[in-house]
């Protein structure tokens, strides 16, 4: 009989946020798979729990994924945790969940802290519709392409960012979204020095030109303004090929340009791809 994989959310700063169910899962586990075993060991030691640990992260997920699946198939119950917060959100836990599903292994979640959601509800920005965008690329071109893809989205956007990248990211957001977009910069969530800075992108750039970013950030960015229904569709007067070529000229890859043009026209990507390459 197969074991079960438990996705356990762990505190994002305050150890008092650990749930009774999380501790129960730790105590009942045959093995705990952790993104950083040293960090998880500190958590276990705090609660006087002694369990075997194995690492599972972006750089070993393929071999460790197969290893964990083999243990689950032999009836072992395994807990998966990330460094902090909920696993499988913008981390390699997503791949392990897929492997379990492919192998008919039960997966369950033990809910708890999620930095993005906590930052969102503190931001003061609309929460009815939002999109989690995760970490932006360290590559400037890829980062700008990502921002271009979402600049016209009307829902609130959630990003994770490291302190050493924050200034470059804000600069790219200013160029792509405009400096008057509202943003909330949330750091040190649930900790003593928790901070929420609510301002515009321009104001954030001015602030961090004089203050060094510290700690991991969640950036909550206001969505684009709704387009008036009476406004003429700017894409009606150009062909799909011209539409895609426009985005390519702005620096997008052909794949991303086709995806963006399809979204603009509310068409399937495959239809836009076929039309763009027709006659080649």
Regions found by a protein language model. Name each.
Residues 95-153:
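Class I SAM-dependent methyltransferase SAM-binding "motif I" and its flanking Rossmann-like core
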Residues 26-32, 104-108, 156-157:
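Short active-site oxyanion
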Residues 1-59:
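Glycine-rich, flexible N-terminal cofactor/catalytic loop recognition
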Residues 2, 156, 163-280:
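A contiguous loop/helix-start segment that scaffolds small-molecule binding in enzyme catalytic cores
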Residues 3-5, 75-79, 155-156:
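Loop/turn-to-beta-strand initiation segments
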Residues 54-62, 136-139:
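Conserved helicase motor
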Residues 92-94, 254:
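Glycine-centered tight-turn and secondary-structure capping sites
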Residues 12-13, 83-87, 163-165, 224-226:
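Short glycine-rich anion-binding loops that position phosphate/pyrophosphate groups of nucleotides
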């Amino acid at each position: 009989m197969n074991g079960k994989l438990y996705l356990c959310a762990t505190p994002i700063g305050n150890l008092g946020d650990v749930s009774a169910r999380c501790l129960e899962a730790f105590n009942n586990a045959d093995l705990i798979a952790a993104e950083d075993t040293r960090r998880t060991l500190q958590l276990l030691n705090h609660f006087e729990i002694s369990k075997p640990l194995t690492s599972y992260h972006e750089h070993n997920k393929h071999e460790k994924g197969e290893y964990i699946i083999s243990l689950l198939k032999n009836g072992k119950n395994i807990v998966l945790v990330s460094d902090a917060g909920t696993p499988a959100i913008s981390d390699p836990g997503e791949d392990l969940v897929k492997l379990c599903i492919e192998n008919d292994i039960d997966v369950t979640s033990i809910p708890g802290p999620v930095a993005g959601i906590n930052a969102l509800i503190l931001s003061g920005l609309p929460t009815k519709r939002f999109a989690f965008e995760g970490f932006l690329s360290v590559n400037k071109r890829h980062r700008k392409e990502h921002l271009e893809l979402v600049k016209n989205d009307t829902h609130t956007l959630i990003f994770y960012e490291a302190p050493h990248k924050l200034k470059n990211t804000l600069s790219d957001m200013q160029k792509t979204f405009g400096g008057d977009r509202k943003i909330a910069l949330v750091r040190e969530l649930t900790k003593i020095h928790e901070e929420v800075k609510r301002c515009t992108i321009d104001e954030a750039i001015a602030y961090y030109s004089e203050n060094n970013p510290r700690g991991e950030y969640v950036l909550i960015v206001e969505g684009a303004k709704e387009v008036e229904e009476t406004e003429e569709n700017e894409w009606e007067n150009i062909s799909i090929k011209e539409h895609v070529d426009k985005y390519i000229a702005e620096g997008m890859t052909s794949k991303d340009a086709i995806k963006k043009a399809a979204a603009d026209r509310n068409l399937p990507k495959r239809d836009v791809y076929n039309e763009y390459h027709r006659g080649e």
